[in-house]
């Protein structure tokens, strides 16, 4: 059967108007019905019989057809559908209805629709033009706004208010369309009709706005957006943040938003009565829309919605029912063998890091942390229904030009669902979600922000410290509970924001000061800092070897471009392996559980001591971070169980982040006045961290030159304190009644250092130095505790000098202090 030919004239309708028969569409309908009846699979069975049987169910009305099957069956039919899609679409739906009737009893008034999947060509949003109106297209983009589902009038039945005649099946052209004239020959009514809703046909209708993805965007261009119209079963198939493919056609619709302005101009000058004015607002204005002002715009009528890249998790990165078998079926044999080979690689951890960031030299710990963030932990739900996040949040703090933004850009390009934004240019609504008014329905709808767009992905936030405080508070909930709660303009909703956050921040003043703790170097609040699992600090230090290596790497990139990049695995290999590894749900073994508890206890003990000062307080959130990192390590090795070796690496990475000890030189120039003040307020001291910071920030007092040189590095101070503590603990274990005084410790230390002392001046200096160290261990770090024997004597015996009283004090090690490894 040949397709083509002009439309032939047909019969006349009741009103005497001539109807035209579309022969091309009729032939398409007949050929398409034959295709549905005759299309066979590899096993010889009909491909669409089972799908058509599903259409008998009341809630189903759409048949999905693979467009490649049509091309294989009849290329001319496929070409006609592609070029004349909007013209032949109603006839294709009738063919589906005829095919479904062969499967069983179907209500006479039930409408059916068709959806085409796997359409070969894909158009960019920027390439849509009026030349493509009515043809079958496939476009892709990221959903930024979804409207609620409404019923749409597709075919109306009207009642003439003059003669009570019924006008059936008036097709609605994307706006409220009344009959042009009453079908009664003796009635000349053209305006007064009422809609009979019981006999009219409605269909589910939803508007979705999509935007160009960052990869398709030309450099320096503003992203274009287009409205998608979804009907029937296609509604609610795309959520805000999804990257989807839409198959359908480009159409022209009246611009309803221009109606208000047009009506306002029209009604102010018109001398009409109240009734006519009401009709003008409700019916006549819509009827005249686009006729006077030519207010039309392009929209996309979609029949099918699919994931942009389902093989790499373009839409659903963490599908709960995803199994190893289903992922394997999506890969070729060679791809699956490569994934299996990677899982057996004994040096997988290192190779993944180098392959993921080949252009960044060094910073191995940050590469490992970002890699574990991409694998992620296991999300859990307690018996009470509380959700525990599995995503890992990472913050990179560093001096300028230390490749912070490069890490963020690499992750954005690699991850299938990542959003890159800047903290200073982002508001709270832009990061979470905004409530905006629809220009047509004047209803409030939710427009997704960066965290919603990155749902099931990674949100990269640069210049995180430049955000306003009120904007930082807005993401508290998203970082821990992974939801966004909105109560604005009558809209109350809780939205998902299951995203990992990779943030980059600059220190206060532009340079990281080692003499201050992390919280004083970064302009971030304590609640925000506690929600990050890993903190990495980058300091721009002058190192001849490192500077040479970095310069060589940069020059190689500029000279040879991609040739100088050495990758063990390609980006596609890592994406496939990441998708496969993320379906593992590792369980914590008994040995790993005990090891996690022991490591957390060590972190808490280390945080309580004054010497090993932490970046921030160790809380239960760090315990949860340790669990998430351990699960991520197990996922990376495709293990179903978390082993102690996974916990060990997670603890090492967490320790690099948490115990970032700021070690300025220790000065002993405080004088004896502080000693007296400390002694009086011994019970009201602050914690060790604050005491350490107070000591660091104090200016050097003007003292005699005898005390001016009493300084030592923090490493030397720590070494001496460890020697003293080890000696005291050894003496307490060997002797039942051990009474070590300050004098005993001084004499023991000088005896140990006898080989290094040559002159009397050095002896006096060493003696004064060890006395100052012991004084600091007692009053500042609280590692040693003094017990005063003079309390047992009478008041007359206590009239001694301060030196005698000090020498008489018994010293013991604080029982809560634990030596570092």
UniProtKB/Swiss-Prot annotation:
<dbReference type="GO" id="GO:0016887">
    <property type="term" value="F:ATP hydrolysis activity"/>
</dbReference>
<protein>
    <recommendedName>
        <fullName>Maternal DNA replication licensing factor mcm6</fullName>
        <ecNumber>3.6.4.12</ecNumber>
    </recommendedName>
</protein>
<dbReference type="InterPro" id="IPR031327">
    <property type="entry name" value="MCM"/>
</dbReference>
<dbReference type="GO" id="GO:0071162">
    <property type="term" value="C:CMG complex"/>
</dbReference>
<dbReference type="GO" id="GO:1902969">
    <property type="term" value="P:mitotic DNA replication"/>
</dbReference>
<dbReference type="GO" id="GO:0006260">
    <property type="term" value="P:DNA replication"/>
</dbReference>
<dbReference type="GO" id="GO:0000727">
    <property type="term" value="P:double-strand break repair via break-induced replication"/>
</dbReference>
<dbReference type="GO" id="GO:1990518">
    <property type="term" value="F:single-stranded 3'-5' DNA helicase activity"/>
</dbReference>
<keyword id="KW-0067">ATP-binding</keyword>
<keyword id="KW-0131">Cell cycle</keyword>
<dbReference type="InterPro" id="IPR018525">
    <property type="entry name" value="MCM_CS"/>
</dbReference>
<dbReference type="GO" id="GO:0005634">
    <property type="term" value="C:nucleus"/>
</dbReference>
<feature type="short sequence motif" description="Arginine finger">
    <location>
        <begin position="530"/>
        <end position="533"/>
    </location>
</feature>
<keyword id="KW-0238">DNA-binding</keyword>
<dbReference type="Pfam" id="PF17207">
    <property type="entry name" value="MCM_OB"/>
</dbReference>
<keyword id="KW-0347">Helicase</keyword>
<dbReference type="GO" id="GO:0003697">
    <property type="term" value="F:single-stranded DNA binding"/>
</dbReference>
<keyword id="KW-0547">Nucleotide-binding</keyword>
<dbReference type="GO" id="GO:0005524">
    <property type="term" value="F:ATP binding"/>
</dbReference>
<dbReference type="InterPro" id="IPR012340">
    <property type="entry name" value="NA-bd_OB-fold"/>
</dbReference>
<dbReference type="InterPro" id="IPR008049">
    <property type="entry name" value="MCM6"/>
</dbReference>
<dbReference type="GO" id="GO:0008270">
    <property type="term" value="F:zinc ion binding"/>
</dbReference>
<keyword id="KW-0539">Nucleus</keyword>
<feature type="compositionally biased region" description="Low complexity">
    <location>
        <begin position="679"/>
        <end position="689"/>
    </location>
</feature>
<comment type="function">
    <text>Acts as a component of the mcm2-7 complex (mcm complex) which is the putative replicative helicase essential for 'once per cell cycle' DNA replication initiation and elongation in eukaryotic cells. The active ATPase sites in the mcm2-7 ring are formed through the interaction surfaces of two neighboring subunits such that a critical structure of a conserved arginine finger motif is provided in trans relative to the ATP-binding site of the Walker A box of the adjacent subunit. The six ATPase active sites, however, are likely to contribute differentially to the complex helicase activity.</text>
</comment>
<dbReference type="InterPro" id="IPR033762">
    <property type="entry name" value="MCM_OB"/>
</dbReference>
<dbReference type="InterPro" id="IPR041024">
    <property type="entry name" value="Mcm6_C"/>
</dbReference>
<feature type="region of interest" description="Disordered">
    <location>
        <begin position="665"/>
        <end position="707"/>
    </location>
</feature>
<dbReference type="GO" id="GO:0030174">
    <property type="term" value="P:regulation of DNA-templated DNA replication initiation"/>
</dbReference>
<dbReference type="Pfam" id="PF18263">
    <property type="entry name" value="MCM6_C"/>
</dbReference>
<feature type="domain" description="MCM">
    <location>
        <begin position="348"/>
        <end position="555"/>
    </location>
</feature>
<keyword id="KW-0863">Zinc-finger</keyword>
<dbReference type="InterPro" id="IPR027925">
    <property type="entry name" value="MCM_N"/>
</dbReference>
<feature type="zinc finger region" description="C4-type">
    <location>
        <begin position="160"/>
        <end position="187"/>
    </location>
</feature>
<dbReference type="InterPro" id="IPR041562">
    <property type="entry name" value="MCM_lid"/>
</dbReference>
<comment type="similarity">
    <text>Belongs to the MCM family.</text>
</comment>
<keyword id="KW-0235">DNA replication</keyword>
<dbReference type="GO" id="GO:0006270">
    <property type="term" value="P:DNA replication initiation"/>
</dbReference>
<feature type="compositionally biased region" description="Polar residues">
    <location>
        <begin position="697"/>
        <end position="707"/>
    </location>
</feature>
<keyword id="KW-0862">Zinc</keyword>
<keyword id="KW-0158">Chromosome</keyword>
<dbReference type="GO" id="GO:0042555">
    <property type="term" value="C:MCM complex"/>
</dbReference>
């Amino acid at each position: 059967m040949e397709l083509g030919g002009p439309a032939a004239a047909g019969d006349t309708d009741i009103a005497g108007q001539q109807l035209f028969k579309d022969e091309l569409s009729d032939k398409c309908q007949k050929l398409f019905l034959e295709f549905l009846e005759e299309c066979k699979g590899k096993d010889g069975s009909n491909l669409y019989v089972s799908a058509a049987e599903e259409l008998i169910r009341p809630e189903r009305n759409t048949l999905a057809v693979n467009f490649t099957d049509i091309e294989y069956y009849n290329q001319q039919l496929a070409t006609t559908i592609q070029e004349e899609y909007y013209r032949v679409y109603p006839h294709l739906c009738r063919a589906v209805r005829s095919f479904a009737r062969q499967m069983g009893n179907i209500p006479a008034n039930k409408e059916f629709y068709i959806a085409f999947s796997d359409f070969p060509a894909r158009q960019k949003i920027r390439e849509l033009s009026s030349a493509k109106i009515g043809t079958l297209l496939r476009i892709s983009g990221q959903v930024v706004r979804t409207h609620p589902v409404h019923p749409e009038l597709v075919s109306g039945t009207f009642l003439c208010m003059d003669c009570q005649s019924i006008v059936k099946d008036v097709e609605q052209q994307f706006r409220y369309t009344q009959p042009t004239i009453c079908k009664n020959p003796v009635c000349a009514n053209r305006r007064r009709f009422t809609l009979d809703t019981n006999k009219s046909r409605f269909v589910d209708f939803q508007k979705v706005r999509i935007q160009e993805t960052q990869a398709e965007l030309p450099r320096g261009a503003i992203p274009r957006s287009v409205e998608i119209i979804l009907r029937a079963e296609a509604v609610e198939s795309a959520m805000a943040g999804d990257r989807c493919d839409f198959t359908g056609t480009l159409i022209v619709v009246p611009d309803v938003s221009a109606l208000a302005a047009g009506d306002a101009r029209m009604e102010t000058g018109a001398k009409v009565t109240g009734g006519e004015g009401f009709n003008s607002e409700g019916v006549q204005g819509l009827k005249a829309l686009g006729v006077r002002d030519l207010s039309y715009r392009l929209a996309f009528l979609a029949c099918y919605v699919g994931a942009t890249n389902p093989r790499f998790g373009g839409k659903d990165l963490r599908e709960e029912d995803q199994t190893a078998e289903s992922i394997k079926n999506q890969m070729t044999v060679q791809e699956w063998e490569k994934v299996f080979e990677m899982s057996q690689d004994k040096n997988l951890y290192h190779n993944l890091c180098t392959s993921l960031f080949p252009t960044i030299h060094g910073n191995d710990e940050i590469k490992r942390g970002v890699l574990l963030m991409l694998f992620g932990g296991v999300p859990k739900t307690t018996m009470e229904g509380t959700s525990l996040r599995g995503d890992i949040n990472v913050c990179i703090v560093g001096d300028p030009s230390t490749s912070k933004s490069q890490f963020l850009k690499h992750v954005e390009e690699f991850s299938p669902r990542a959003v890159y934004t800047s903290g200073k240019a982002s508001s709270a609504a832009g990061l979470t979600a905004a409530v905006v008014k629809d220009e047509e329905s004047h209803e409030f709808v939710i427009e997704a922000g960066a965290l919603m767009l990155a749902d099931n992905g990674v949100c990269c936030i640069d210049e995180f410290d430049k955000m306003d405080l009120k904007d930082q508070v807005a993401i508290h909930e998203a970082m821990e509970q992974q939801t966004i709660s909105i109560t604005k303009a009558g809209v109350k909703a809780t939205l998902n924001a299951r995203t990992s956050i990779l943030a980059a921040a600059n220190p206060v003043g532009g340079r990281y000061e080692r003499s201050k703790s992390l919280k004083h170097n970064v302009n971030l609040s304590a609640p925000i800092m506690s929600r990050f699992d890993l903190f990495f600090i980058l300091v721009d230090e002058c190192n001849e070897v490192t500077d040479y290596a970095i310069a060589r790497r940069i020059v190689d990139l500029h000279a040879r471009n991609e040739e100088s990049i050495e990758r063990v695995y390609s980006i596609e290999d890592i994406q496939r392996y990441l998708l496969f590894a993320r379906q593992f749900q590792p369980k914590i073994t008994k040995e790993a559980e005990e090891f996690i508890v022991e490591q957390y206890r060590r972190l808490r003990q280390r945080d309580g001591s004054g010497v090993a000062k932490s970046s921030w307080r160790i809380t239960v959130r760090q315990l949860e971070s340790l669990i998430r990192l351990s699960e991520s390590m197990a996922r990376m090795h495709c293990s179903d169980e978390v082993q102690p070796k996974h916990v060990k690496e997670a603890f090492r990475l967490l320790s690099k982040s948490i115990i970032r000890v700021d070690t300025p030189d220790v000065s002993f120039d405080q004088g004896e006045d502080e000693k007296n003040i400390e002694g009086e307020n011994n019970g009201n001291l602050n914690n060790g961290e604050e005491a350490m910071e107070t000591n660091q920030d104090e200016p050097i007092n003007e003292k005699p030159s005898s005390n001016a040189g009493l300084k030592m590095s923090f490493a030397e101070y720590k070494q001496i304190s460890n020697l003293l503590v080890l000696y005291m603990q050894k003496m307490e274990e060997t002797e039942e009644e051990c009474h070590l005084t300050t004098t005993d410790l001084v004499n023991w230390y000088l005896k140990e250092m006898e080989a290094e002392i040559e002159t009397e001046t050095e002896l006096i200096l060493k003696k004064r130095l060890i006395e100052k160290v012991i004084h600091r261990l007692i009053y500042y770090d609280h590692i040693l505790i003094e017990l005063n024997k003079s309390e047992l004597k009478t008041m007359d015996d206590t009239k001694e000098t301060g030196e005698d009283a000090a020498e008489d004090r018994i010293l013991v090690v604080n029982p809560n202090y634990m030596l570092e490894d």
